[in-house]
From Swiss-Prot:
Compartments where found: Cytoplasm
Regulation: Allosterically activated by ADP and other diphosphonucleosides, and allosterically inhibited by phosphoenolpyruvate.
Residues reported to bind Mg(2+): 103
Native source species: Enterococcus faecalis (strain ATCC 700802 / V583)
Signal peptide (residue range): none
Positions annotated to bind substrate: 125-127, 162, 169-171, 222, 243, 249-252
UniProt name for this protein: ATP-dependent 6-phosphofructokinase
Biological function: Catalyzes the phosphorylation of D-fructose 6-phosphate to fructose 1,6-bisphosphate by ATP, the first committing step of glycolysis.
Reaction(s) catalysed by this chain's protein: beta-D-fructose 6-phosphate + ATP = beta-D-fructose 1,6-bisphosphate + ADP + H(+)
InterPro entries: ATP_PFK, ATP_PFK_prok-type, PFKA_ATP_prok, Phosphofructokinase_dom, PKF_sf
Length: 320
């Protein structure tokens, strides 16, 4: 394989630049040319493609976001969009593609695979909701960003003896809420993957107040409901001096953590190895601290991401 293309798609995640850097440098080290595709699959179809050199990825490993930019492009789900994309890849002489992104990006890579074009998926999303890997690029940075906010909010919550509902991103997955909640000593963690009873939540808050507790922190995954809606429902069971903090897109930004930089570097290098060996139609992951590759079609069609619910039970046992 003489030429590899790379794109980032969907929501950005800290560490994407580190992955791009690894792909570019590993490729050049192995004598392979790399072409960067701007704006994801939209840029692919439009032919917004340029050659990348070592200098292009210098001073990038510490930066959040993606310097190749990203975009959502639902048209790539159509036959016309896919064929146009393959036409552009062939026009530039690109023989294999690295796709960094989340679930939608993986489906784009899978579509190319089904049409006979070798593509390798790298999991890059703060949501940590991709099957076939324990952790995705950007997740560690995201939970540390949330954790910093939890620590700050606790200060003001204690000063005013308040309950705070902290809404965090994650789409339909509760991993960000779960991990940051345990690390931040949350009183309650509300996630889509586990039922909850508002009456019991209110009961636990009141029990804490009765023991003299000066704050209550509830970490709410956005996939359950909005923070303001949750606070309104909670108020039906008592006045807990509740305030709502919606962290939103701030969780996506910032310099990637050491863990995300290392993870991204490992994934990027391995993606090049796979394509160099002529292997496409795969997605890369980290399972039991080992970098692995699995069939992307099988992974998407027959697997479903599951959070570590033992953390939910742990928090319930130690959060009173």
């Amino acid at each position: 394989m003489k030429r590899i293309g790379i794109l980032t798609s969907g929501g950005d995640a800290p560490g994407m630049n580190a992955a791009i850097r690894a792909v570019v440098r590993k490729s050049i080290f192995d004598g392979i040319e790399v072409y960067g595709i701007n704006y994801g699959f939209a840029g692919l179809v439009a032919g917004d493609i340029r050659r990348l050199d070592v200098a292009d990825v210098g001073d990038k490993i510490q930066r959040g976001g993606t310097f190749l930019y990203s975009a959502r492009y639902p048209e790539f789900a159509t036959e016309e969009g896919q064929l146009k994309g393959i036409e552009q890849l062939k026009k530039f002489g690109i023989e294999g593609l690295v796709v960094i992104g989340g679930d939608g990006s993986y489906h784009g890579a899978m579509a190319l695979t089904k049409r006979g074009f070798p593509a390798v998926g790298i999991p890059g999303t703060i949501d940590n909701d991709i099957p076939g890997t324990d952790f995705t690029i950007g997740f560690d940075t995201a939970i540390n960003t949330v954790l910093e906010s939890i620590d700050r909010i606790r200060d003001t919550a204690t000063s005013h003896v308040r309950t705070f509902v902290i809404e965090v991103m994650g789409r339909n997955a509760g991993d960000i809420a779960l991990w940051s909640g345990v690390a931040g000593g949350a009183d309650e963690i509300i996630i889509p993957e586990h039922d909850f009873d508002m009456k019991n939540v209110a009961k636990r808050i009141q029990e804490g107040r009765d023991r003299g507790k000066k704050h209550c922190l509830i970490i709410l995954a956005e996939g359950v409901m909005g923070g303001n809606e949750f606070a309104d429902k909670l108020s039906e069971y008592g006045d807990f001096h509740t305030r709502v903090s919606i962290l939103g897109h701030v969780v996506r930004g910032g310099s990637p953590s050491a863990r995300d930089r290392v993870l991204a570097s490992k994934f990027g290098s391995y993606a090049v190895e796979l394509l160099k060996e002529g292997k496409g139609g795969l997605c890369i992951g980290m399972l039991d601290n080992q970098v692995v590759a699995a069939d992307i079609i099988d992974t998407l069609e027959n697997n479903k991401h599951k959070p570590d619910l033992s953390l939910y039970e742990l928090n319930h046992e130690i959060s009173f």
